[in-house]
Amino acid sequence: MLSNSSQVILRNSDYFQHQDVLILNYEADTLGLSLLAHAKSVTALALDFNHYLQLAAKEQPQLACFFGHTLPSSFAGKTFDSVIVFFPKAKSLAPYLFELAANHLNIDGQLMIVGDNKGGIKSVAKLIPDCFSAPVKRDNARHCLLYTCQLERQGRDFKLENWLSQYSLSTPQGEIIICNLVGVFSEKHLDLGTELLLSHLPKLEGRVLDFGCGAGVITVALLKAMPKLELECIDINAMALASCELTLQANKLQAKVYPSDGLTQVTGAFDAIISNPPFHDGLTSTTDIATQFVAMSEKQLKSKGIWQIVANRHLPYASTIAQVFGNFDVPAENNKFKLYACRKK
């Protein structure tokens, strides 16, 4: 099953005949495989680990798939005939992807941008670097828009630091430095949920997991308070993981940072799991994911292991936590968030 955006790309497959094609911000389907009927080769970069896993299972000699915020170093200087960019949900990420595209596109090569027509893509002309020609709308179907333009001249060298903001953050554990790449959630002050969590941290020791680490706020606060922790940080988003690693470096701290689709890539048992899980909108699908997170995280805890999360108070966590863990406490709450704490039997 192809997403609407991917279906629009396939409608325009004549553009890719016998070409080497790069896809940036790859979505969760098998478009890469379908394009091989037209293109010479397809290389895909997924920023979401779940999206990567779906295509990685289909890899073959002319189809390569990678996860990360950039292509591997072996692709430095490698250029393609066409680059497809899936317009990101975080609009601030779009110029980053366009500059990355420019660094991997032949001069006069084609950039294709596709996205939901209500997802911000209509502002593409304001976001494209001036090394490209003006984008032209080529298709409007499946509630999506497709734009194309050409690389007229070489753009500036791609440097990650051009897309990084760094700032100090006051936490209950003291001042910390946060490194935030575009597209990663940031308020440049401690959000109310994380503040509630950090203000009521239990004493921890041993192996601890920060689920949905984002830019590393909770990670660094934990290590500031308890530097002997064996901390592991997971997220599904490549920009978040890169931000977390940079945040750790800036604070001269160390932790294991790696991608995981939920808790699927996590191995072994933990003494504690601490999280401000990224499930906020209250949709049925989100509630289901949150429910799965509770059940799976209990299985990753050692006996007597500590589990503590902060969540929007309207999300129905309580019944699931009671069902999975039995008893639980609410050490603190405010008008927006609740802190849930329990210990595995």
Curated annotation (Swiss-Prot):
| Main localization, broad class | cytoplasm
CDD domains with a match to the protein in the record: AdoMet_MTases (cd02440)
Q: How does it assemble?
A: Monomer.
Q: Which reaction does it catalyse?
A: guanosine(1207) in 16S rRNA + S-adenosyl-L-methionine = N(2)-methylguanosine(1207) in 16S rRNA + S-adenosyl-L-homocysteine + H(+)
The entry lists its GO molecular-function terms as:
16S rRNA (guanine(1207)-N(2))-methyltransferase activity; nucleic acid binding
Q: Where in the cell is it found?
A: Cytoplasm
Q: Which family does it belong to?
A: Belongs to the methyltransferase superfamily. RsmC family.
Per the UniProt entry, the Enzyme Commission number(s) are 2.1.1.172
Question: Which stretches are annotated as coiled coil?
Answer: none
Q: What does this protein do?
A: Specifically methylates the guanine in position 1207 of 16S rRNA in the 30S particle.
UniProt xrefs under InterPro entries: DNA_methylase_N6_adenine_CS, Mtase_sm_N, rRNA_ssu_MeTfrase_C, RsmC/RlmG, SAM-dependent_MTases_sf, Small_mtfrase_dom
* Entry keyword Cytoplasm: yes
| Catalytic EC class | transferase
Return the GO cellular component terms, semicolon-separated: cytoplasm
Protein name, entry field: Ribosomal RNA small subunit methyltransferase C
